[in-house]
């Protein structure tokens, strides 16, 4: 990846750490190739594979249709405990938002059918793949249904007045919050047949299509921390009583999270 461009290919589908499957669209009349890394097998120092959190290509054309933001790296994992007072980040180079814990859903436009489609990590068509009979899979379907209820009109995404205003050249990544069931737009990517280009939040949050969506689509709360060291950042997160923050690089879109110390124990 260079300067916010993610070049993506089906060629990685044979790697052991990748899950590859053929999925259908909502109407059942088109197929997709979906690539998603298996978090139990992937090595997270492999930046190339980390890009394939959930990527959708047309089948059999192999053209990129949808890109999901790569998994967020926990910044604390890179900090030596003895260096917690040393500078680890330059705030002016990042956009800082509240961390939203929830289910990620990706909205994209299929150029073959001229219809909007919905993808989650392991499936398309607005349905969750039930993996290993885990209860979390059933919970995920609930949040998919919440997404549809908020954006569909008369049961159809294509009739939604909000979606009608969206650029069809982009894919949109939402998180349906586990805490308040609100729908947050967390990432936008310009889609080309070969690559996805990162769009800054400071840009898309001011697009006209999002001017009158209050209460339907939310943006994560913005923070302006001057803190540079891990010790100071963690104190800021604790002081604001939030789950954590996400630092997004303004240059290439790479994301790092800093979680509140009680986040993993509550």
Residue ranges of each PLM-predicted region?
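Core nucleotide-handling region used for phosphoryl-transfer chemistry
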Residues: 1-266
């Amino acid at each position: 990846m260079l300067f916010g461009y993610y070049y993506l290919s089906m060629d990685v589908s044979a790697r052991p750490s990748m899950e590859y499957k053929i999925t259908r669209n909502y109407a059942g009349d088109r197929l997709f190739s979906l690539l998603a890394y298996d978090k139990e097998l992937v090595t997270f120092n492999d930046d190339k594979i980390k890009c394939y959190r959930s990527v959708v290509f047309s089948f059999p054309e192999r053209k990129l249709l949808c890109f999901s933001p790569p998994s967020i790296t926990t910044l604390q994992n890179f900090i030596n405990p003895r260096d917690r007072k040393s500078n680890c980040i330059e705030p002016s180079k990042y956009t800082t938002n509240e961390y939203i814990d929830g289910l990620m859903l990706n909205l994209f436009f299929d150029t073959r059918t001229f219809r909007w489609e919905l993808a989650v990590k392991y499936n398309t068509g607005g349905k969750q793949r039930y993996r290993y009979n885990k209860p979390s899979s059933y919970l995920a379907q609930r949040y998919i249904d919440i997404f549809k209820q908020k954006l569909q009109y008369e049961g159809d995404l294509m009739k939604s007045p909000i979606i009608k205003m969206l650029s069809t050249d982009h894919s949109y990544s939402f998180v349906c919050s586990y805490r308040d069931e609100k729908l947050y737009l967390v990432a936008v990517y310009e889609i080309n047949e070969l690559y996805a280009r990162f769009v800054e939040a400071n840009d898309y949050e001011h697009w006209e299509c999002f001017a009158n969506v209050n209460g339907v689509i939310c943006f994560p709360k913005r923070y302006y921390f001057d803190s540079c060291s891990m010790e100071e950042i963690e104190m800021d997160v604790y002081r604001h009583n939030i789950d954590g923050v996400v630092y997004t690089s303004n240059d290439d879109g790479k994301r790092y999270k800093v979680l509140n110390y009680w986040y993993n124990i509550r």
